[in-house]
Structures are given as C-alpha cells and as structure tokens.
A protein has these predicted regions:
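Glycine-rich, histidine-containing beta strand-loop boundary motifs that form or position
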Residues: 62, 118-121
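A short, polar/charged loop-to-alpha-helix boundary motif
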Residues: 68-75
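Conserved beta-strand in the GNAT
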Residues: 49-51, 57-67, 80, 85
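Exposed loop/turn and edge beta-strand positions of beta-sandwich/beta-sheet ligand-binding modules
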Residues: 46, 75, 80
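Conserved N-terminal entry element of GNAT/NAT acetyltransferase domains
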Residues: 1-12, 147-152
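Amide-forming acyltransferase catalytic core, primarily the GNAT-like/NAT-type
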Residues: 16-22, 26-47, 52-53, 108-112, ...
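Conserved acetyl-CoA-binding loop-helix of GNAT-fold acetyltransferases
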Residues: 86, 91-106
Length: 181
C-alpha cells in the first residue's frame, strides 16, 4: 500500500468520486450532473474535503458543503459533512480517523467556524472518536411552508438555525436527481 492524502478537487475528480460512492453506498444516485450540482454550484461555496488514495486509486474521503448558520443571531460559516466513506477493502485500518483529522485541519485553515456531522449509528462513534466531535443528540428539524420570511420569523426563539435565501432555495430545487418541475 502507498497511502497518500490530498485536498479534494471537485472539478477534476468527479468521476473518481462517483466510482467510490457507488461502491460504498447502496444507492446508485451518484452521477456527473448530480455531483457537479452538489459540489460546484452550491451558492454557499464549493465542496471542501480530503481525498485518500492508494497509489492513484481513490479509497476514501471526508468532506462537506459550506452552509451559513446562525448561532444566537451570529452568522457562522459551517461545513456539513456529506458522502463520507472508506472503500470496504480498506476499512479497519483507521483511515477514517486519519482523513478526518486532516479534514479538521483543512476546515480550520479555511476559517470555518465548525463542522456538523450527521452520522448514522455506525458513523457517529467514529466521528466522536476521531476528532472529538460532541454528540448533541438526534437531529430535530422543522419545515415551514408559506410566507416564512424575516418579517414573520422570530429568530430570538431559536439558538441555532439556517435561513434559505432565494438563491440557496433555487439551487436546492434544481437538484438534477430530484426534478421538481
């Protein structure tokens, strides 16, 4: 094995990401249009992450998407982790912890305020152990429909939230895998 780590390149490496994701995840939802939309057209910024290679073969990745959140009405730059995986043939070698550690340093270097990792039952302990994330509990969310805007949303009732601008909402509705119209 010749393991190396590189900063993710979401313009150049989409084909490699598709191959890795489709081998690690049960759904075959990954394609060029979808990943280009998700990683390169997000109005909050491009995908940021660490890729792990064995020679020239992508075997793992930890990364995420920039999203603006508010904590007690202060705007924060946060990374939400997505599509985190290690190839089945390389699991059990502590690669996730090594990649996650490098990812945490990359996030700090790029002046983000934090990482949100929404993990399943097997991923959550790995996140906590690898970079000492704090488990805040299960995700609670609400969705509002209709005329929700700054005039009728009382942000003082919520400590932590994200507001979806027209630009972000339009981007989200243009997901090529989930056409709305």
């Amino acid at each position: 094995m010749n393991i190396s780590y590189k900063i993710s390149n979401s313009i150049k490496n989409l084909e490699q990401y598709i191959n890795l994701y489709n081998s690690c995840f049960s759904e075959d939802k990954f394609n060029l249009d979808y990943l280009n939309w998700l990683y390169n057209k997000n109005p909050c910024g491009h995908y940021i992450g660490i890729d792990c290679f064995d020679n020239d073969v992508l075997i793992g990745q930890v990364g995420g998407m920039p999203i603006e959140f508010f904590w007690k009405e202060k705007k924060l730059k946060i990374i939400i982790s997505i599509n985190v995986c290690v190839d089945n043939n390389y699991r059990g070698q502590k690669l996730f912890s090594k990649i996650a550690d490098k990812f945490e340093m990359l996030v700090k270097t790029n002046n983000f305020d934090g990482i949100i990792a929404i993990g399943n039952k097997s991923a959550t302990p790995a996140w906590i152990k690898s970079i000492n994330l704090t488990n805040l509990g299960e995700l609670e969310a609400f969705l509002g429909l209709g005329e929700i805007n700054e005039d009728n949303f009382d942000s003082s009732q919520y400590d932590f939230y994200s507001c979806w601008s027209e630009k972000r909402l339009s981007w989200r509705l243009n997901n090529p895998n989930n056409k709305i119209f």
